[in-house]
Amino acid sequence: MVRRRVLLATFPAQGHINPALQFAKRLLKAGTDVTFFTSVYAWRRMANTASAAAGNPPGLDFVAFSDGYDDGLKPGGDGKRYMSEMKARGSEALRNLLLNNDDVTFVVYSHLFAWAAEVARLSHVPTALLWVEPATVLCIYHFYFNGYADEIDAGSNEIQLPRLPSLEQRSLPTFLLPATPERFRLMMKEKLETLDGEEKAKVLVNTFDALEPDALTAIDRYELIGIGPLIPSAFLDGEDPSETSYGGDLFEKSEENNCVEWLNSKPKSSVVYVSFGSVLRFPKAQMEEIGKGLLACGRPFLWMIREQKNDDGEEEEEEEELSCIGELKKMGKIVSWCSQLEVLAHPALGCFVTHCGWNSAVESLSCGIPVVAVPQWFDQTTNAKLIEDAWGTGVRVRMNEGGGVDGCEIERCVEMVMDGGDKTKLVRENAIKWKTLARQAMG
């Protein structure tokens, strides 16, 4: 019997790679071979980190194409040109791959690789979108471009869209906010128009039925299918205890600073974990406020501050700029990278201060960890709304007049979910409930 082969066309960012690789593992277990199609930059980074040491599982192969940015897009680089080159070169590479490999029977693509769907359709290969944000966000975009733009643009704090919870403006995806350049809305519209090119288009969403039951059925034009949570088995159903990593880290974890060993020395539910993902970089003033807030809490913390490189390729560490770095290192631990799931699953973890990227949100739900939400852009603002109001697993910080977060606000929110009061108990009960439901979703 000939095995089927699915091609996963994946945008070269950690937030896209992690769920795509986890989906690939699920396909392999179901007897389907997988070709993972991404850029040379991502492939090289994945191949050079410890997560790749075990090698590829049988049935999984990688195909990398050069987008002209094999060392990645430099800070301050031309993002528009980068995406244009990615589309032109990626389309050509995919076209040639499908032409010369007739064993690919299906293409699943990231929404930032919408061109992959167009190429696949010209080759008469069926497609599905892998949506790596909540179904609610896809619904908001869909309704915005299909009759609800005026209502959303009006700036109301009671925006009611079909089958979705009431939204206020600050909870909309930032692409739809007035201050966002029009070109970003047009880009998203273009992605959805590609999806609309197929009758009853299939959308695979990193969510599960109990988490977003209404959003998954809100768009008649699409078939939304919850396939999540897309996280390694060891932290979810436990069927494969050895599966402790997504297997595609773009950044090397801090081997010299063993996070788990440090966590082992801390009491249960005592540690504050702080991480704002692989892309976001706060200005120095905001980092200082976060540091002040952590010190004011007086609780042990683990803070992931990613190393940055300047235009000359030299490493810069934000922690070195902090005026309170000495005090911070006495009270907590600062690392440049760590295995987030290992941290979230550790008994010492008490709460997660996060930017609310969707992968981080799904991981915190699956591990039963309360959240302090500090959303910045894209879907993060909507994710924070869902965490606080729909699922009740955390609290969202209040921004100051300058759009930042004061240290005292960080302290206030951390204490709300950790001080043992009524709010703490409610948030923890909800976190455990969703942890249980996430595991049941795999049944």
UniProtKB/Swiss-Prot annotation:
The keyword Acyltransferase does not apply. The keyword DNA-binding does not apply. Keywords: Glycosyltransferase, Signal, Transferase. UDP-alpha-D-glucose binds at residues 340, 355, 358-360, 363, 379-380. It catalyses: an anthocyanidin 3-O-beta-D-glucoside + UDP-alpha-D-glucose = an anthocyanidin 3,5-di-O-beta-D-glucoside + UDP + 2 H(+). Its EC number is 2.4.1.298. One of its GO terms (molecular function) is quercetin 3-O-glucosyltransferase activity. It is an enzyme of class 2 (transferase). The active site is at 16 (proton acceptor). GO terms for biological process: anthocyanin-containing compound biosynthetic process. Pathway: Pigment biosynthesis; anthocyanin biosynthesis. An anthocyanidin binds at residue 16. It comes from the Eukaryota. InterPro entries: UDP_glucos_trans, UDP_glycos_trans_CS. It holds the Pfam family UDPGT. Residues 1-22 form the signal peptide. Catalyzes the glucosylation at the O-5 position of anthocyanidin 3-glucosides to form anthocyanidin 3,5-di-O-glucosides using UDP-glucose as sugar donor. Anthocyanidin 3,5-di-O-glucosides are molecules that are responsible for pigmentation. Also acts on anthocyanidin 3-O-(6-O-malonylglucoside). Much less active with hydroxycinnamoylglucose derivatives. No activity in the absence of the 3-O-glucoside group. PANTHER family: GLUCOSYL/GLUCURONOSYL TRANSFERASES (PTHR11926), UDP-GLYCOSYLTRANSFERASE 75B1 (PTHR11926:SF870). Belongs to the UDP-glycosyltransferase family. This is Anthocyanidin 3-O-glucoside 5-O-glucosyltransferase 2. The lineage of its organism: Eukaryota, Viridiplantae, Streptophyta, Embryophyta, Tracheophyta.
